[in-house]
Amino acid sequence: MKIGIIGAMEQEVAILKDKIEGLSTVTKAGCTFYTGTLNGADVVLLQSGIGKVAAAVGTTLLIAEHNVDVVLNTGSAGGFDSSLNLGDVVISTEVRHHDADVTAFGYEMGQMAQQPAAFIADEKLITTAEQALTEMSDKHAVRGLICTGDVFVCTPERQEFIRTHFPSVIAVEMEASAIAQTCHQFNTPFVVVRAISDVADKESPMSFDEFLPLAAQSSSEMVLNMVTLLK
């Protein structure tokens, strides 16, 4: 099995990149692909860039040119579930766009035309993620709906919009739905596993930039454990 791993930013892939053996690097269309073995598994690690378009371009190349069998999306996310704290982990059961609106044509809020309302994560990969979490006894995890938009959600108004239209949302970020939609169109199994860098409605002594390295550590540890189980 060849495992594809996607992170948007350098900070989100650096820990994993440093652990890849036989590393080779290719850059194309603004995306950087790191190929080699990780904990004995064949992997292609993609630094896609931030946002849905960058993520879709990178995921397309990852599947079509690098021929990965499964896709794991790692990195940071903003928590919406009240039980989440900084450094906790979210695992996708489904992923939706929160910034798409073609409801005028009878679609659900967040549903793109001619696409399903939600992109369903692979059940086997979800199970693998939960098994990987058992090696991280200090981390709390929530599984559920992750919502994506080309918006850094930082205002009460946007938070309320998302809660109103997607009441079961557990976390938000800026790439997962594009990755999920691309995987859906290629019929490639995926799961999103991210660490919480900030939580809606909770005060934190640390800023997003300050906590990002810690979130990257948590999400990278999860991915390393998953890769070991999948190889």
From Swiss-Prot:
PANTHER family: 5'-METHYLTHIOADENOSINE/S-ADENOSYLHOMOCYSTEINE NUCLEOSIDASE, 5'-METHYLTHIOADENOSINE_S-ADENOSYLHOMOCYSTEINE NUCLEOSIDASE. The lineage of its organism: Bacteria, Pseudomonadati, Pseudomonadota, Gammaproteobacteria, Vibrionales. It holds the Pfam family PNP_UDP_1. Belongs to the PNP/UDP phosphorylase family. MtnN subfamily. It comes from Aliivibrio fischeri (strain ATCC 700601 / ES114) (Vibrio fischeri). The keyword Amino-acid biosynthesis applies. Its EC number is 3.2.2.9. InterPro entries: MTA_SAH_Nsdase, Nucleoside_phosphorylase_d, Nucleoside_phosphorylase_sf. The active site is at E12 (proton acceptor), D198 (proton donor). It is an enzyme of class 3 (hydrolase). Pathway: Amino-acid biosynthesis; L-methionine biosynthesis via salvage pathway; S-methyl-5-thio-alpha-D-ribose 1-phosphate from S-methyl-5'-thioadenosine (hydrolase route): step 1/2. This is 5'-methylthioadenosine/S-adenosylhomocysteine nucleosidase. One of its GO terms (molecular function) is methylthioadenosine nucleosidase activity.
